Amino acid sequence: MSTTNVFITGANRGVGHALAQTYLARPNHIVIGSVRDIAAARSNGLGDLPAAPGSELVLVKIESASFADPAQAVVELESRGITRLDIVIANAAIAGRKVVAAAEGDAEDFANILAINAVAPMALFAATKPLLDRAANPKWVSISSAVASLANHDAMFTNMGGRPMGFGYGASKATLNHLSLNIHSENPKLTVMAVDPGFLDTDMGNRGAKLFGMEKPPHSTVDNAKAIVKLVDAATRGTHSGKFFTFDGDEVPW
């Protein structure tokens, strides 16, 4: 039986881990998870995720700051007989060292955020495109953020009481959104969308919650990962491509 091949970056923790878990629970799914350290990821439980019949987890090394690693990962996949990708989820990201106003920003930190959150997904797409092209109904998903919406920026800034929102992270995700639109426009066979995964109970989300005086983030990583997978299932070129959605399917203005 044919498998559905899903590539997820940053699969060792957070929503990437939950997405890998969700897809592995489905029969006949090959889940390729990228991690910085394969041995560490296996020892931390990623290798112990239960897999449905015909499903398998394959780990590849991608250091997000390395723009060469995605191409090497694809070489490794092809050597293992994985020559087609049905879904690629660009998930790996960082928030930066601290949330500050633009006037107080650290240029090196900003450049690093952009490199990992926007440039690395470009390198990932360049590397995986030939494998996506071999799929009958290929899909590319950029894990974005609510703070990437330029249309909603002023309202969000007001809702946060005028506190800094982390301009580096927001700018990097807005750049990722623009990349997603370009991928959509340039590849008529692909279904391409950006998805805000929600305010999740991850390491990054918990730090953000404390910053804004919250006890914890409002959303469950496991529940929202299941919602994202449902959204990806429903996505078609005609209905979803070239658009930005919340995890539960509401369209977000760019």
Name the predicted role of every residue range.
Residues 9-12, 16-24:
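N-terminal Rossmann NAD(P)H-binding glycine-rich loop of SDR-like oxidoreductase domains
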Residues 63-83:
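Conserved Rossmann-fold cofactor-binding substructure of NAD(P)-dependent oxidoreductases
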Residues 24-43:
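Conserved glycine-rich Rossmann-like NAD(P)H-binding loop of the short-chain dehydrogenase/reductase
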Residues 189-190, 194, 202, 206-254:
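C-terminal helical subdomain
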Residues 93-122, 129, 133-185:
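Catalytic loop of short-chain dehydrogenase/reductase
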Residues 49-68:
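Rossmann-fold cofactor-recognition segment
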